[in-house]
């Protein structure tokens, strides 16, 4: 179950919130849902260089609030705010009614943001990097940035092989069934000459206890507690020939 379900949907309402927050009747619901999808596609297309991790949409009456979480907020805002003004004008054309407000939130640590890690791997593969090297480097970068665990899954015609397969790189601990685990999940597509590769990334940063994420310290052994090479068998003495003879 934990391997198949979307980690964000599995923890929705527990450690994860909704990306679209609004209420609508049965007749308006489908139309507003399509508008949200168009807004997200527009943001991803126009601001692909800004490192967009998440687009949240809030609706209250005739007000539409779009919150963009980006690794490079300066690209979203633009020089003198020109880019964000143009983006707001484009979004207003997609919205049926109401005024639009666009807010930008900076991601403090992009290296542990799963959507951004997946996008970085996809860009490297599209530039003909070795896929194993890209996966391992991304996992190491995530662990060095303070994450407790990371899992990267790459599927498709890896290396141009005739038969599609899947490869996984895992570092640290990534709990799949612990609902209080703070797991960030992101996907991306790498379009290559031999087909499309799918990338999934899960980043575990700690457990949410009392409304805040608490990191779990890794168990460490002291120097005097470390076992010698060979385990307990190295400390066992073999009986000498004289002792064996005396025992007989």
From Swiss-Prot:
InterPro entries: KH_dom, KH_dom-like_a/b, KH_dom_type_2, KH_sf_prok-type, Ribosomal_S3_C_sf, Ribosomal_uS3_bac-typ, Ribosomal_uS3_C, Ribosomal_uS3_CS. The keyword rRNA-binding applies. Residues 39-108 form the KH type-2 domain. GO terms for cellular component: cytosolic small ribosomal subunit. Residues 221-234 have a biased composition (Basic and acidic residues). SMART domains: KH (SM00322). CDD domains: KH-II_30S_S3. One of its GO terms (molecular function) is structural constituent of ribosome. Residues 214-248 are annotated as: Disordered. One of its GO terms (biological process) is translation. Gene3D superfamilies: 3.30.300.20, Ribosomal protein S3, C-terminal domain. Keywords: Ribonucleoprotein, Ribosomal protein, RNA-binding, rRNA-binding. Residues 235-248 have a biased composition (Basic residues). Binds the lower part of the 30S subunit head. Binds mRNA in the 70S ribosome, positioning it for translation. PANTHER family: 30S/40S RIBOSOMAL PROTEIN S3, SMALL RIBOSOMAL SUBUNIT PROTEIN US3C. Part of the 30S ribosomal subunit. Forms a tight complex with proteins S10 and S14. Belongs to the universal ribosomal protein uS3 family. This is Small ribosomal subunit protein uS3. It comes from Deinococcus deserti (strain DSM 17065 / CIP 109153 / LMG 22923 / VCD115). The lineage of its organism: Bacteria, Thermotogati, Deinococcota, Deinococci, Deinococcales. The gene is rpsC.
């Amino acid at each position: 179950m934990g391997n198949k379900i979307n980690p964000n949907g599995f923890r929705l309402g527990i450690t994860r919130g909704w990306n679209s927050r609004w209420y609508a009747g049965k007749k308006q619901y489908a139309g507003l849902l399509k508008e949200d999808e168009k807004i997200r596609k527009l943001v991803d297309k126009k601001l692909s260089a800004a490192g967009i991790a998440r687009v949240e949409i809030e609706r209250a009456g005739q007000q539409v609030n779009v919150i963009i979480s980006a690794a490079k907020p300066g690209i979203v805002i633009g020089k003198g705010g020109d880019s964000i003004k143009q983006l707001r004008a484009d979004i207003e054309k997609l919205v049926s009614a109401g005024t639009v407000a666009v807010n930008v939130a900076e991601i403090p640590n992009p290296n542990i943001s799963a959507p951004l890690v997946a996008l970085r791997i996809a860009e490297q593969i599209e530039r003909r990097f070795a896929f194993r090297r890209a996966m391992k480097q991304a996992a190491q970068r995530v662990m060095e940035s303070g994450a407790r665990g990371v899992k990267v899954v790459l599927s498709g015609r890896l290396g141009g092989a005739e038969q599609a397969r899947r490869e996984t790189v895992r570092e640290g601990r990534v709990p799949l069934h612990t609902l209080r685990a703070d797991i960030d999940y992101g996907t991306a597509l790498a379009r290559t000459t031999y087909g499309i590769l799918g990338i999934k990334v899960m980043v575990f940063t700690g457990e949410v206890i009392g409304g805040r994420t608490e990191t779990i310290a890794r168990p460490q052994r002291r120097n005097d507690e470390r076992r010698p090479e060979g385990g307990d068998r190295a400390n066992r003495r073999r009986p000498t020939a004289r002792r064996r003879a005396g025992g007989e």
